[in-house]
Regions:
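Extracellular parallel beta-helix/beta-solenoid repeat domains
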Residues: 15-28, 32-431
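Right-handed parallel beta-helix/beta-solenoid
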Residues: 1-16, 33
Length: 431
């Protein structure tokens, strides 16, 4: 192993590191400050990078991207930095660690702070690039700028972003706009497969962990705090396993599936929030089918009109989802459980998701919705006086809603919108 010293006088360390990874199979970053004022292409023969406990990697203020560009590696790479401080406010920043078209990379034990734009760790595929498989992000501590729904999309930060390559229909570049018009999610032409994201401590960011076009991932034992959204699985993310995570004081969805997320397992996670709002804390919507939400523990102490609309939520072309044995303590504004076939702001009922909403999401559904199971869940609060809401609007029928064994506080009632278009409902009082 070669021990490399940082340049004297806070000079740029970019060339020093470029040379080191090309000539050494293992390198160790000595104590001191490592100034990274450009993107470093880390292609070379190096297979392991470690750092002294007093080695600080610093990304200074800049007008261009900075960080480690991990691609075209000759062998698997394990990168174990200690402290990484980002000071840049460049809006085009990607990430201190940018993995693109590259598999078999491990980022472990990094303490990353100061993320103002972009991501802390970004994993991407391009359509014509190499397969990106078996990336591991473990034991990292990440701090990103806190943002909310009102921040423009290009200013939202994400702690860990994993994005496969999507292909949209001609004329569309947004999953939401394509689904409204065509009722189909984007196609994944190059997924990112089998990532492992485990035991990370994440504070802030619009998303703590964002999965888009990801297949077969394992997301476990992470702490996500003060995020707008904790964990998002979108854009045809398939067969991911999300277990034993903690989502604390999120604003919007804690864990959600959307736009073609299929066959994901979300179980044994802990969610606690005193500031949650939005649709629901656990949710599958907009073309998300066959997902299982099981054994999760959810506590929401938000009060008044800022409460989330639902605790569990399933809507819009999202059949065959299972909500089983979840423990939910707290209240929601509209109903504890919401199952809705479509959205329409013409429905003049405050407990419908799109009540007084914009026209943007009207008529989102492309088909009828069926086969939602809500079984053996435990609810521990008496508000909002509505336990289960079943809603059929815009002629999109709702059927085969199977409920059994739920423990619901006494005094709660169930409610229905478009009851004439709802059928095959089992064990829902009042139907």
């Amino acid at each position: 192993m070669a021990t490399i010293n940082p340049p004297a006088g806070n000079a740029s360390a970019v060339q020093t590191l470029r040379d080191a990874v090309r000539s050494n199979e293992e390198i160790h970053l000595a104590r001191g400050t490592w100034i990274i004022d450009d993107q470093i292409d880390m292609a070379g023969i190096c297979g392991k990078i470690t750092a002294d406990v007093e080695a600080i990697i610093r990304l200074p203020q800049n007008t261009k991207r900075e960080g480690f560009l991990l691609r075209n590696l000759s062998k698997p790479l394990v990168f174990e930095p200690k402290k990484v401080v980002s000071e840049t406010t460049f809006k085009g920043q990607e990430a201190p660690f940018y993995i693109i078209n590259q598999g078999n990379v491990t980022i472990r034990g990094a303490d990353i702070s100061g993320i103002q734009y972009g991501h802390a760790i970004s994993v991407r595929n391009t359509k014509d690039g190499d397969e990106c498989k078996f990336v591991t992000i473990a034991n990292c501590k990440i701090q990103a700028r806190q943002v909310d729904e009102r921040v423009n999309a290009d200013e939202r930060t994400t702690a860990i972003a994993v994005n496969g390559t999507l292909e949209f229909e001609t004329g569309y570049s947004s999953p939401n706009r394509q689904y409204v018009a065509l009722h189909k999610p984007p196609r994944v032409v190059k997924p990112i497969s089998y990532p492992i994201i485990t035991n990370n401590d994440i504070t802030g960011g619009y998303y703590a962990i964002e999965l888009s076009g990801v297949h077969g991932g394992h997301i476990t034992y992470n702490w996500m705090k003060l995020n707008t959204r904790g964990l998002s699985m979108q854009n045809s993310s398939v067969s991911n396993q999300v277990r034993y995570n903690n989502v604390i004081d999120n604003i919007s969805a804690a864990i959600h599936c959307a736009y073609g997320a299929v066959g994901n397992i979300i179980e044994f996670n802990n969610i606690e929030s005193t500031r949650a709002e939005g649709e629901g804390l656990l949710q599958a919507y907009v073309g998300s089918t066959g997902n299982i939400f099981r054994g999760n523990r959810v506590s929401c102490n938000t009060e008044g009109d800022t409460r989330p609309k639902y605790m569990l939520y399933c809507a819009v072309d999202s059949g065959s989802n299972v909500f089983e044995a979840n423990y939910l303590n707290g209240s929601a504004k509209n109903a504890l459980i919401g199952v809705e076939s479509d959205w329409s702001n013409t429905i003049n009922l405050a407990y419908h998701r799109s009540y007084r909403a914009s026209n943007d999401d009207n008529n989102m559904a492309g088909d009828h919705m069926r086969a939602v199971s809500i079984c053996r869940n435990v609810f521990r609060d008496g508000t909002p006086y509505r336990a289960i809401l079943l809603s059929s609007v815009n002629g999109k029928k709702l059927s085969d809603i199977y409920c059994y064994g739920n423990v619901i506080p006494s005094g709660l009632t169930n409610d229905f919108i478009g009851k004439e278009n709802i059928s095959q409902v089992f064990n829902v009082q009042g139907f």
